Amino acid sequence: MNFLILLLATLVAATPIPRELAQVRPRGTVLKASAADPKLIPVTDELVFNVPLETFVARRNKQDPAALDFASDNCTTAPDNPLGFPFTPGCNRHDFGYQNFQAQGRFTVENKQKIDDNLEKDLKHQCTTVNILKRPVCNGLAEVYHVAVRKFGGLDDIQVKRDDALEAEYQEKLATYKALEAEYLRLKARSG
């Protein structure tokens, strides 16, 4: 588990984020020009923020609409399904949001925050599918992933200002997660 924490903590270092567009792509992919069509803006918003995650997954599997960019490197450098928690679908929607907002000229600090917040919502939704005893650990890790993408996400082509408050929040969420994990392991050991 310390490997996971180290992996999340070492995603990327940073300096000031521009309010203008940023080139945010899963590693090794090329921006899909057709995603920039203004008619696709409401469809993008719907898929990122309004449909259930399961609907997004079904649309992604069909590449519907084909003009949007559904490429993803899953959870980038963090584990995709840590401890068996099904985080990949949420990470895929997060990548979809970053790259299509970027292609549409709407990837701003504010929209990055909304997309990052939606990731936390999606990951916590996925946590409802895991064993009830593991749920607090899953939710705690979802919060760590959320703060990690707020702090480090979208940095392949941009630099983000170091934020002491965000660093403190990240450390707090990490400590909470570690405590939840320790409690889960203690309960698991007691129950045999």
Which ranges hold each PLM region?
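Cleavable N-terminal signal peptides of Sec/SRP-targeted secreted and luminal proteins
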Residues: M1-P16
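Extended terminal accessory/targeting regions
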Residues: T15-G192
